[in-house]
Amino acid sequence: MDEPRPEAANVDSQQNSQCCLTRSEVYALVREVINKRKHHNLVTNVCDHVFDDGFEEQLKYIRANIDKALITVGGEHKHCKRLAAHIKKINKIFKLNKSLETEYKQSIDRYGSNRFNRNN
């Protein structure tokens, strides 16, 4: 029987790792965006919190540059993960509800009111 080639295993693990984006990778992306914008003196709203309206500047920068965005992942066998495939997830992560009332209304719209009515 032929010995498995380590290169093939490494390629497979690289392909499989492209399909998920971790929270720490999203945090790393935001940190790098802020650092890059500061480096180029694009400091408008760079200190705004994710709940502030000014944070949209970071998201605009991410969307404009997502095709060039890479995250280096892995321990012993490091490789780069492209982030362009994850733009929908990134947009969803940062589309945050700022009030419980809004979140409740969106949950009702999504799942229906019967699910939240305990009297039934």
From Swiss-Prot:
Q: What are the alphabetically sorted keywords of the record?
A: Transcription, Transcription regulation
Give any Pfam family that matches: Baculo_LEF-11
Keyword field contains Transmembrane: no
Its domain of life reads Viruses
The GO biological-process annotations, alphabetized, read as:
regulation of DNA-templated transcription; viral life cycle
Record's keyword annotation contains Transcription regulation:
yes
InterPro entries the record matches: Baculo_LEF-11
Relate the protein's function as given in its record.
Answer: Involved in late/very late gene activation.
Q: According to its UniProt record, which protein family does this protein belong to?
A: Belongs to the baculoviridae LEF-11 family.
Write the protein's name: Late expression factor 11
Q: Whose protein is this, by species? A: Mamestra configurata nucleopolyhedrovirus
